[in-house]
Amino acid sequence: RQRLDSSHVIGLVSHMSRLECVQETLRLALEALEPIEALARPVAWSVWWERYVASKLDYRTEAEPLRAKMAQAGQDAHDLLRWAKGQEGARAARKAVELLERVYAENFEEASGEAVDQRRAQPPGAVHNPHDPEAQWSTKKTTAQKEWVGYKVQVAETVEAQPRAAKEPTR
């Protein structure tokens, strides 16, 4: 006999907004690319560094400036990815660049090669925290709705059937 059970495992990551996720992924990519010598870096490097590594997002900002920051982050990610593809030194930071490429593709659409538009909805399996990109956002609709970022786990138990006497309770 086989018994199946499922549960959820909460990831050890904070819940991030889409803007936070994009900005944090940009920060991780910039830090991974930092060992590249200064002369090989793009002109906008110091601006990106100030924008994503040296400063933090103010959550009390109104919606319109947050939309502008998301558009700016999308353009910066686009420019950084385009620059990183042509760099020999960027190979050492391959994982961070690939993660940035994934987050960029999940959050933005290219309109005319340069301009980027924010996607209305993220695809299933989208990155919700760059520190654990495999952790997924999930919800369970019960009497009290549960939401979490983490993993779903299914466990299968196999039990050999035990011979029992008639009218004996099952175990």
Which residues does each predicted region cover?
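Polybasic low-complexity intrinsically disordered regions
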Residues: 1-171
